[in-house]
Amino acid sequence: MKDENELRQDLVDAYLTVDKRGLMNQASGNVSCRFRDGMLISPSGADAENISADRVVYVDGEGNYSGDIKPSSEWRMHLSIYKKQESANAV
């Protein structure tokens, strides 16, 4: 199993791949992956120019996060998917 830092970088790589393929409209796309009892998710206002592993936000299973960087405004939808679909490991 990958550690948190590897998952954070994988998330950034996925974000950049989705952006490069033209599947995001400016800062309107987000990616996440299941981690611990919650998820890692792209930050609010992310774009290809400012996303980095240290800006990825951990949101626990109750929707809590810490720090100055806010998770994507879509975090509730992502967390709901993980709660309802155990086989989902990334959104």
List the predicted regions and their residue ranges.
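Short glycine-aspartate micro-motif
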Residues: 90-91
